Amino acid sequence: MDQPWMRQDDDESDDESSTVDFGQAVDGILFLIDATEGMFEEVDGDTAFMQCIKAAKSTMLNKITSSPKDLVGIILFGTDKDNNPNRFKNVYVLQDLESPGAESVLKLEKLIADGPKKFKQEYGHGNVNMADVLWTCALMFSKSRAGQRRVLVLTNQDDPHKGSGDLDDKAVVKAKDLLQSGIELDLVHLKPPGDKKFRPQILYKNLVTDKENYEDGFPEASDKMEELLLRVRMKDHKKRRLMSLPFWLGPEVKMSVSLYNLVRPTGKPATTRLARDNNEELLSRRITYAMDSAEALMPGDISKTQEYGGRKAYFDICEVKQIKSMAPPGLQLLGFKPLSYLEKQPHVRPSHFVYPDEGSVRGSTRLFAALLQSCLRHRVAPICFWISRAAQAPKLVYLLAQEEERDPHGLQMVPPGFHVVQLPFSDDRRRLQALQEGTTKATPGLVALAREMAEKLRFTYHPDKFENPELQGFWSCLEALALDRDDAEHPKDYTRPDHEKMKAKAGEEMDAFLEAAFPDGCSATTAGSRKRTQAGEGGQAKKARSENQGSNVDVREEAKRGKLASLTVSVLRDFCKQEGLRCPSKKAEIVDCIKKHLKL
């Protein structure tokens, strides 16, 4: 059974959806929360322990909405009572390592509502043995299916063992065992009570996994809830790499890099089909059948065809992949261009972020850093030939260098690396029609008034300040339904203009602009309605304009130039009608039909 060999949607799928299956990559994070008496000293009506519980709850809610299959667990250390598989003293497993749900969130809310006194009655306070705590972490991860495993310690006590060097040494040995097992350990330290300073060099500096991040010293301890939530979110939300690729700088110079997605639009989760009787998730299967015999076909039984000279050429799946594979996946350096030239290039699609991958090719970090510093110093960008995966169409990209930035506390805010920005090909550019003559132009005085008004209303935009109101309302309703609450929270819509603030900042400028733009006898409302009326006098006018634009296109000339694919379907169909040709349903078939008619 043959199929026409045409460009399918899956052949042009996005790199992020075709390279890595995010559904199979499950992250696991364990919160180790200090429950000793020092965490319960009240400051401004709150305690460090309750702040940590609120941070863990916030992480659970974020996981439910963004990564529902990820695993989250909570271990309290320094309690009087114990609850763990090995019966270690002073270690209490509050939440097993599992996907967070309504029950786990409600449990934390109850713990917060009960307060410190109820906690002391139920759990109590005791001593700390970090080796036992880390052993419990390793045991919990060994029974889970987590791929990327992390342990996050939250404490304001820099000396949990009270000067016991023997216990410190045992904890360091156990931390190394975690590292060998692929478990990362990190620290979020809070400000100790009083005027004390947190001293990580006593113990925790030797426990954390990524010591390179703390070569310039640990950031200052957080003392505010907002800062604690930010740090926990940054530690938890480690970017999962999209792919690892070789980067060829020359015939014999190669390094390895990893690609990440820094920013992508968030959408609603995909619909999951459930069985009617037991609510179990249904698995979908697709089977291809032969039209003549209704026999189920295997992938090797299916071939694709392409017509050449009136005859069909048959290709199996492997041959099609070989034809499409122009080169192995990777980045190939072609040259350099100044940033002043590249800043004028149009936007094609969202960019990726490149970071060195030392684990695949040794020395990649040094070579990558040298290239990054040279590009920043000379203000140039490498131009590269990029193939993201096998049988993927090649792309031309340039690498935009980004310098590292840290906040006043030493916390990294912007990572060093390159943004991979795609360059357009010639056929990606649209041919825009020239503006019609006779259009009304604003006077210089009106432009000056508009500029003054815009200057007064200018502010620094950051995407973190504007949440999608539709998504926030959707998740708020789901949260209320899952937690059995009567009313859902109504999130504030920050995308709507704040008219009071706008009037306070630029009220005079706005009034002056309206008076100049709409003099006596003409208001903004009537002008807008008249404009809408003229635009809505019927789709007939718009249709007539599009037909006139299509009639101005010389299809024969475009066919000789090989630009038929850039024309719209309506223009191609009009040409087929004029020539008396049978008009197929698909654009590619229409193009082939016109080529045959013109003998091209």
UniProtKB/Swiss-Prot annotation:
Region: Disordered, residue numbers: 524-557
Positions of the SAP domain: 564-598
Subunit note: Heterodimer of a 70 kDa and a 80 kDa subunit.
UniProt main location, coarse: nucleus
Entry protein name: ATP-dependent DNA helicase 2 subunit 1
Record-linked CDD domains: KU70, vWA_ku
Job description of the protein: Single-stranded DNA-dependent ATP-dependent helicase. Involved in non-homologous end joining (NHEJ) DNA double strand break repair. DNA-binding is sequence-independent but has a high affinity to nicks in double-stranded DNA and to the ends of duplex DNA. Binds to naturally occurring chromosomal ends, and therefore provides chromosomal end protection. Required also for telomere recombination to repair telomeric ends in the absence of telomerase. KU70, of the KU70/KU80 heterodimer, binds to the stem loop of TLC1, the RNA component of telomerase. Involved in telomere maintenance.
